[in-house]
């Protein structure tokens, strides 16, 4: 969006005079004081400026907003006055509604913002002049300048008003091959997208895309309008597909994402094409179409490798691992997750590292490889401690504790199954002290790798008892 410089304008006579008495005071002045001040001003002007007309005297008395309106009417800009007056009424209505909802409403009244009033006067009157001359491109440019000026959070509704005006005027411009119409569709798409009306946004972005196909048009920053159309359309399609997937409308989501993928290929942007493949692959995964999901995600993997984009490659490995895990192919899933862990570690992506380590720990835990599961969960937990993320810390702490309990369960079960006096003594000793428990040296060779010392386990359990969440319970 264009950032406009300060406006070098020649002000009408009344507003030029009125400007000299700014800034306006927001305090309410008693009527008696106003009458006295009016008399004082009249006397002062009569003594010192005998040549002033009544209109010039009125410029000092009236508000800046009123002088702007008077100048518009005096100069014959009746349409500009009507539009400005309607905007001022809406401005006051919105301020009043916001004041009722919040005691901290800081938006100033329009009469206390002379710069905005100047912009209104300058561009609205120029647009009206251009409209009289049937120069619709100049009308568009002046209205668009106002939209750019009011592109801030508190005035976005004003920006949207001028976007809509630009859209109507753009339909009348026939000399530029449809460029202004394409830009107007882009702005209307943004308007609806920000308002959450995705279907309406998609309609405008589709028209924007159609008008820019085969064109070399660029925006004010030098970016291709066709590429912007592709990006906007893909973003909207993805948001629409997310809603469809939430409602389990898998076929519709896949259909719209296939369309997005085709548009991405037209844009000749490999990164954008890869993103489209990624979301399409996830949609196939949600629909349990695993083979198709693997094929599409493999395309994303190849594009990420070609672009030397490690972070995208990590996302591809994660998604492929989820598909393989859903198929029950945990061995291959582990391979891809290890690659994901390596990329996350090398690129200092802590959240990705936590997620990958947790996924690996879950798989190892399900397979009964409790030592490996415990190691992965511990890595995830240690990383969340560094991140100081309490929700993640609590989640990984639970995973870690479960894996350590499973480790201990193997040793305890073996002692119980032995049913001899020595094993019973070990169990009773541990039960009393909750300290170390050692495997029976006689039966250890038969237990193999499944029998472990729990001295390390108990240390970890004590460590878990010192976690932040448990300290509250002790107190």
Swiss-Prot record:
This is Tetratricopeptide repeat protein 29. TPR repeats lie at residues 92-131, 136-173, 182-215, 234-267, 274-307, 314-347, 354-387. Residues 459-475 have a biased composition (Basic and acidic residues). It comes from the Eukaryota. InterPro entries: Bac_ResReg_Asp_Phosphatase, TPR-like_helical_dom_sf, TPR_rpt. One of its GO terms (cellular component) is sperm flagellum. It is found in: Cytoplasm, Cytoskeleton, Flagellum axoneme.
């Amino acid at each position: 969006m264009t950032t406009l410089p300060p406006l070098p304008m020649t002000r009408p006579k009344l507003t030029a005079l009125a400007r000299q008495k700014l800034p306006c005071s927001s305090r309410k002045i008693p009527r008696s004081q106003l009458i006295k001040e009016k008399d004082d001003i009249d006397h002062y002007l009569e003594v010192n400026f005998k040549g002033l007309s009544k209109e010039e005297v009125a410029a000092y008395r009236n508000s800046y907003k009123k002088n702007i309106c008077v100048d518009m009417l005096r100069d014959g800009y009746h349409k500009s006055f009507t539009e400005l007056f309607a905007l001022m009424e809406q401005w006051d209505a919105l301020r009043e509604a916001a004041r009722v909802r919040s005691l901290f409403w800081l938006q100033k009244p329009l009469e206390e913002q002379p710069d905005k009033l100047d912009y209104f006067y300058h561009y609205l009157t120029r647009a009206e002049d251009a409209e009289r001359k049937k120069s619709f491109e100049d009308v568009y440019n002046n209205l668009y300048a106002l939209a750019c000026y009011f592109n801030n959070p508190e005035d976005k509704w004003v920006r949207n008003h001028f976007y809509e005006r630009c859209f109507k005027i753009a339909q009348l411009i026939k000399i530029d091959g449809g460029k202004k119409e394409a830009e107007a569709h882009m702005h209307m798409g943004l308007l609806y997208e920000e308002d959450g009306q995705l279907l309406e946004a998609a309609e405008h972005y589709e028209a924007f895309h159609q008008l820019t196909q085969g064109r070399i048009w660029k925006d004010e920053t030098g970016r291709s309008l066709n590429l912007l159309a592709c990006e906007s359309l893909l973003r909207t399609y993805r948001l629409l597909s997310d809603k469809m997937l939430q409602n389990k409308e898998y076929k519709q989501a896949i259909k719209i994402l296939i369309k997005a993928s085709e548009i991405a290929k037209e844009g000749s942007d490999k990164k954008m094409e890869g993103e489209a493949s990624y979301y399409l692959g996830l949609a196939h995964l949600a629909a349990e179409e695993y083979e198709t999901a693997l094929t599409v995600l493999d395309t994303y993997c190849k594009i990420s490798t070609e672009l030397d984009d490690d972070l995208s490659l990590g996302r591809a490995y994660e998604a492929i691992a989820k598909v393989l895990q859903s198929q029950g192919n945990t061995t291959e899933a582990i391979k891809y997750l290890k690659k994901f862990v390596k990329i996350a570690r090398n690129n200092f992506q802590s959240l990705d590292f936590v997620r990958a380590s947790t996924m690996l720990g879950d798989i190892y835990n399900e397979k009964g490889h409790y030592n490996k599961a415990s190691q992965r969960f511990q890595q995830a937990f240690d990383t969340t401690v560094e991140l100081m993320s309490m929700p993640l810390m609590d989640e990984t702490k639970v995973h870690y504790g479960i894996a350590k309990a499973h480790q201990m369960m193997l040793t305890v079960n073996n002692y119980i199954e032995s049913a001899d006096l020595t094993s019973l003594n070990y169990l009773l000793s541990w039960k009393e002290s909750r300290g170390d428990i050692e495997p029976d040296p006689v039966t250890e060779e038969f237990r193999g790798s499944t029998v472990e010392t729990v001295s390390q386990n108990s240390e970890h359990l004590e460590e878990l008892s010192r976690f932040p969440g448990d300290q509250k319970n002790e107190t």
